[in-house]
Each structure stands twice: as C-alpha cells, then as structure tokens.
Design a protein with these regions (language model features):
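Ribonuclease/tRNase effector modules and their secretory precursors
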Residues: 1-120
Length: 120
C-alpha cells in the first residue's frame, strides 16, 4: 500500500472509531453538528493544497473547530436544500476552512469537509 493510501486508510479507521456519530456544538447556528460517514469520507477525499497536513488535522478536528472563526456561508444552486457554513482555521501555516453543512429540509447539521478555499 502506498504511503498516501496508507495515510488515508489510517485516518478513515481512526475517524470511524473516534468521530462517527459524535456531536460537537456550532456557535454560529446554536446547533449540534454530527460526524457522519459521508462527511468524514468527503473530508478525507477532498483535494487540498496541503493534503497530507489536512489528513493529519482530521484527528484534531474538534479542537480546530473550537478555535476556528466563522468566515461565512453559501448556498449551492445545484443543491438548494443545503447551506454550507465555513470556519477559518490554519493548516500548514495557511488558511483552510472547515465546512459545516445544514440540510434545510431535515435540519441535519453535519461536518462536511475541510477545504483550502471557499467555493464561489
């Protein structure tokens, strides 16, 4: 197994054991944020300028989120049932964003990804 595949597999296994189903509090909305398998996989697979550092940050996501700063939200025209909220954090000494997604129909708020730029 290559180093990258091995790193991804280790982070996924760790996240399944330690994050899946766990809840953290989002101060911007006052809602609970759930860690889902979809969000965990999205965070692991999402391209990033500092991909390995992003993978290394996932086990620390709760602390990073707690220290993050709200940076705005957006709607996706192709998915009007979701609003995405962005929280600025630092990975590899550069700004990255923790993405929290809220389903406007079901009310589910989940951790969705970590990105290096906000989608326009």
């Amino acid at each position: 197994m290559s180093g990258l595949k091995e790193s991804r597999a280790k982070v996924l296994a760790w996240a399944k054991e330690h994050l899946l189903g766990k809840v953290m509090y989002e101060p911007q909305s006052g809602k609970e944020v759930v860690f889902t398998m979809k969000g965990i996989k999205e965070a692991i697979n999402q391209p990033h300028a500092h991909y390995l550092e992003k993978l290394a940050a996932i086990p620390h996501i709760e602390d990073l989120f707690e220290e993050s700063v709200y940076a705005g939200d957006s709607l996706d025209e192709s998915r009007p049932d979701y609003v995405y909220r962005y929280y600025a954090t630092t990975i590899a000494n550069e700004v990255s964003f923790i993405v929290i997604r809220e389903n406007l129909y079901t009310g589910l708020v989940d951790f969705y990804s970590i990105v290096d730029k906000i989608k326009e």
